[in-house]
């Protein structure tokens, strides 16, 4: 039988396709060998398991930031006497010119801006206008605190709160340096009237030194409100919360409660409930 051109083309096509398939199969076998060889060489360069055990373990975070060891019992007593005996006579002489409660604040060249957020808070106190002209209340005039509400602000930076920035912030919140060498928030932003709450250094002995404020730093501060205390404790507590929040937001701090747990909205509401319960007990005792 004579083979035509068409049959020859079919045979040649089959041979070409078979050759292509064979070449592809050969290349695939050779590629697998090379890939395995490369993987083996790469794996051989890895260090032994015995020498790299730490690479397989979870990352370890070393806590180098320790919270200051100050609890509620270490806070200055609101009924404690003024500690003037420990100061040198020259330092007391400097403070005598500016008064006991506000020494050297005029010499700090700080532009204190009484912002609207805090001036509006003053409207919570019915006797605010009278308090501006009233004499400043001494913390010694207050009865001993039966209960203390504490809000601590802990600095997230390892260097802590710097003195000048800290002073500027709390002055804007209406706190004034005063008795017991700590800061107090009075009924008036000017520093007159009754004491609403106070702020102490979280590092023992809990005091501040305005003469060395430029070199001062602290890892944390504590705001505290004593009961019995201000005539309107719930409003005073709200002002204290606002001051603590302002400090934490502007100076990179973290709010903590008296148990050194993160201050939450539930904790703040629990504090308010403690105030309500204290006022209820006080009314019951008067009857």
UniProtKB/Swiss-Prot annotation:
Record topology, Periplasmic segments: 1
Cytoplasmic-facing ranges: 23-287
Record flagged with keyword Cell membrane: yes
Keyword Cell inner membrane among UniProt keywords: yes
SUPFAM superfamilies associated with the record: Cell-division protein ZipA, C-terminal domain (SSF64383)
Localization in the cell: Cell inner membrane
GO cellular component, one term: plasma membrane
Key words, A-Z: Cell cycle, Cell division, Cell inner membrane, Cell membrane, Membrane, Transmembrane, Transmembrane helix
SMART domains (alphabetical): ZipA_C
Biological processes annotated in GO: division septum assembly; FtsZ-dependent cytokinesis
Superkingdom of this protein's organism: Bacteria
Chief location: membrane
Stretches for region Disordered: 70-143
Membrane topology, as annotated: Single-pass type I membrane protein
Transmembrane segments: 2-22
Family note: Belongs to the ZipA family.
Xref: NCBIfam families: septum_zipA
Purpose of the protein: Essential cell division protein that stabilizes the FtsZ protofilaments by cross-linking them and that serves as a cytoplasmic membrane anchor for the Z ring. Also required for the recruitment to the septal ring of downstream cell division proteins.
Subunit structure: Interacts with FtsZ via their C-terminal domains.
Record's protein name: Cell division protein ZipA
Species of provenance: Pseudomonas fluorescens (strain SBW25)
């Amino acid at each position: 039988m004579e083979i035509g051109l068409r049959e020859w083309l079919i045979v040649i096509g089959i041979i070409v396709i078979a050759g292509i398939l064979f070449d592809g199969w050969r290349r695939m076998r050779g590629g697998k060998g090379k890939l395995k060889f490369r993987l083996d060489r790469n794996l051989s360069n890895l260090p032994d398991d015995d020498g790299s055990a730490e690479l397989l373990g979870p990352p370890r975070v070393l806590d180098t930031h320790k919270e200051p060891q100050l609890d509620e019992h270490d806070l200055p007593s609101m009924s404690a006497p003024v500690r003037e005996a420990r100061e040198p006579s020259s330092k007391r002489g400097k403070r005598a010119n500016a008064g006991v409660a506000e020494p050297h604040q005029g010499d700090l060249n700080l532009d204190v801006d009484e912002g609207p957020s805090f001036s509006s808070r003053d409207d919570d106190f019915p006797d605010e206008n009278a308090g501006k002209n009233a004499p400043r209340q001494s913390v010694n005039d207050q009865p001993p605190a039966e209960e203390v509400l504490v809000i601590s602000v802990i600095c997230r930076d390892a260097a802590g709160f710097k003195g000048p920035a800290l002073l500027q912030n709390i002055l804007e919140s209406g706190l004034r340096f005063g008795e017991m060498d700590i800061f107090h928030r009075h009924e008036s932003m000017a520093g007159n009237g009754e004491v609403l709450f106070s702020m102490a250094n979280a590092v023992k002995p809990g005091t501040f030194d305005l003469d060395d404020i430029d070199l001062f730093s602290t890892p944390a501060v504590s705001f505290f409100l004593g009961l019995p205390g201000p005539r309107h404790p719930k409003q005073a507590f709200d002002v204290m919360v606002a001051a603590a929040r302002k400090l934490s937001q502007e100076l990179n701090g973290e709010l903590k409660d008296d148990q050194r747990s993160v201050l939450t909205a539930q904790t703040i509401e629990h504090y308010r409930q403690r105030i309500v319960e204290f006022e209820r007990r006080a009314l019951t005792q008067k009857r």
